[in-house]
Amino acid sequence: MPIQPVTQPLTEPFAQALAEAEQIIARAPHVTSERDLAEGHDYLAGSIQASLRLAWAYQRDFPQFVQSTGPYSKMGLDNPDTLYFHAYLRDDAEYVVTGTRGSTADLSFQVLKGDYTPVEVPDSLTAFDDRAITIADDGRFEFRLGPGKARPGYFTLGPGSAMLLVREVYSDWAAERRGIIRIYRPDQAGYAPPPAIDTATAAKRYAVAGKMLLSRLRTFLAFPEWFYLNEPANTMTPPRATPGGLATQFSSAGHYDLTDDEAMIVTVPAAGKETAPYQGIQLGSMWYISLDYVNHQTSLTADQARVDPDGRMRFVISERDPGVANWLERTGHDRGYVQIRWQRLTRDLQPDDGPQVEIIRLDELPRKLAFYEQAQMSELQWRARVAARQAAFAERMLG
């Protein structure tokens, strides 16, 4: 049977979404320079890649964990210390999650209802970390998700449950190793999904990818307006439960606006492993994504950072090298976001657990930064530190 001539390309809905997406990037309120626009197109490229991949990976009966965001498909102020995976769910089906626990600082699970939209954060129906499941001496674990009543090893999928999000979080990049995790429907094991090789399915997937792309861009341009930009520049909020319902995580958020002659000193107590096995700080661009965290030190965990003799960590955010260990490079971004996260908490945090911020002239740093002499780092030491970041990241194999 001859193939009929194409009257409308199957990719037309996605092509239209792509044209609209380019306008969203160009009209973003923070775009004031060629560099802003160029970075926006890098962000757009990653979002295109992710939207196409996720549209083709959508499968609720034969689910697999797919990478939600990563170094080449950033979104939502992605944490440089975190591996993000998700699988799609039906709220009336039962799933088995099995795997082997790695040595990362935290492993958490979150069931979401729907998806992020430009007007709301999705409801978190269930959220827990691996302390809520049984892990054998060899690291193996198994639990179930389904519509039944909650019990040990079984978590209820509430009405509207749509996605299981998994976060695996590093504190020591060099020493910790990721685990193994798998999801499946036991009633579908050994079967195969129906073939999806018709043009109608392809057209639907292109349309879905286009909708995903636009929603992704609109949402995460609006997200900072809800939680960041309503605060004064060069301040950070007290610790608070992280929006979106992630269990046992608090965060402190802010945005900076600095000249090349200025520095922001962020001083925060080191919570300690007994309170927060994971504590980390990062910078982000106005596109609400992480900066280059592989080749530049734009993030630090408590394990990576220098802790002063008084039990506090002092981070210096600046464009020019201040010559200290806890320099956070803003890599040409005079405006951006800064966030501290505490995870796997054993107690709620109080304002005294949060950061204090001071804006200074960079040449005042030797007088203004406590323990300045001990904090200094040579150029050779700095290059070794960056090389260690590059090597540790490469071993994650996230290309």
Regions found by a protein language model. Give the residues of each.
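A compositional/structural signature for long, glycine/proline-rich flexible linkers
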Residues: M1-G399
